[in-house]
């Protein structure tokens, strides 16, 4: 019995060793290779997974950065739009105020010009009407020689007006009346002027019906105006100043 058992054991060992050799010879290398390949695949898969995770993380960070940049750009665009709108509002307001100021100034200028035109027209009408009335008064209620008498009296009052005129370079003196006066009055006026203005100047007597009454005296470039129009204008300007027109 003991011999059988030993033989069986030895046989089993031999079989086991043979099986081990066969497994090692034909199967162990393949198994190890398969296991190595699986391990490498698993490692490669893990590395790929880690790579994908890193790429995903990078993409997430990149997207967050892009979103942050987009938010900043959007905020910048909104701020620029608000600033532009505010500037446009200020510019429009300033331009509107400037245009309004120009309109007011223009309206004031137009009103002033129109007022001046109306006053000038009224002045001309008043002067013309006053001249007509005074001329008609002279014709109806005063003798014919009254106008010459008036001119003569005006001429007699020339002393103070001519006193300050320098007569050194006077070449011409012109006396203008509304109507032709007598030669006697002309002589009287010329003598009066020559007594006041020394020198060899030329004397000219002229007629201008638009004067109305009185006379105009040109001594060189200097004018002594004793015409009806002049005195009526002075009265009119005085009235305007008093009434603060």
From Swiss-Prot:
It comes from the Bacteria. InterPro entries: ATP_synth_B-like_membr_sf, ATP_synth_b/b'su_bac/chlpt, ATP_synth_F0_bsu_bac, ATP_synthase_B_chain. Coiled coil: none annotated. GO terms for cellular component: plasma membrane; proton-transporting ATP synthase complex. The chain crosses the membrane at residues 3-23. Signal peptide: none annotated. Keywords: ATP synthesis, Cell inner membrane, Cell membrane, CF(0), Hydrogen ion transport, Ion transport, Membrane, Transmembrane, Transmembrane helix, Transport. The keyword Transport applies. Belongs to the ATPase B chain family. HAMAP family: ATP_synth_b_bprime. PANTHER family: ATP SYNTHASE SUBUNIT B, ATP SYNTHASE SUBUNIT B', CHLOROPLASTIC. This is ATP synthase subunit b. It comes from Dictyoglomus thermophilum (strain ATCC 35947 / DSM 3960 / H-6-12). The gene is atpF.
């Amino acid at each position: 019995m003991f011999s059988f058992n030993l033989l069986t054991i030895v046989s089993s060992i031999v079989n086991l060793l043979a099986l081990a050799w066969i497994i090692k010879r034909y199967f162990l290398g393949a198994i190890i290779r398969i296991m190595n390949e699986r391990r490498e695949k698993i490692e490669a898969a893990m590395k790929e997974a880690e790579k994908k995770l890193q790429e995903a993380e990078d993409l997430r960070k990149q997207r967050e950065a892009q979103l942050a940049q987009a938010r900043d750009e959007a905020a910048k665009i909104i701020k620029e739009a608000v600033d532009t709108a505010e500037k446009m509002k200020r510019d429009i307001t300033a331009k509107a105020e400037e245009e309004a100021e120009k309109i007011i100034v223009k309206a004031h200028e137009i009103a002033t010009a129109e007022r001046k035109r109306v006053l000038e027209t009224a002045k001309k009408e008043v002067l013309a009407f006053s001249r007509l009335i005074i001329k008609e008064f002279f014709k109806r209620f005063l003798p014919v020689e009254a106008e010459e008498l008036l001119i003569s009296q005006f001429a007699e009052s020339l002393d103070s007006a001519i006193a300050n005129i320098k007569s050194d370079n006077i070449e011409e003196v012109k006396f203008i009346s509304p109507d032709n006066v007598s030669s006697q009055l002309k002589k009287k006026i010329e003598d009066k002027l020559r007594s006041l203005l020394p020198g060899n100047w030329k004397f000219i007597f002229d007629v201008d019906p638009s004067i109305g009454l009185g006379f105009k005296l040109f001594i060189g470039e200097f004018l002594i105006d004793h015409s009806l129009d002049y005195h009526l204008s002075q009265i009119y300007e005085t009235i305007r100043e008093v009434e603060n027109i």
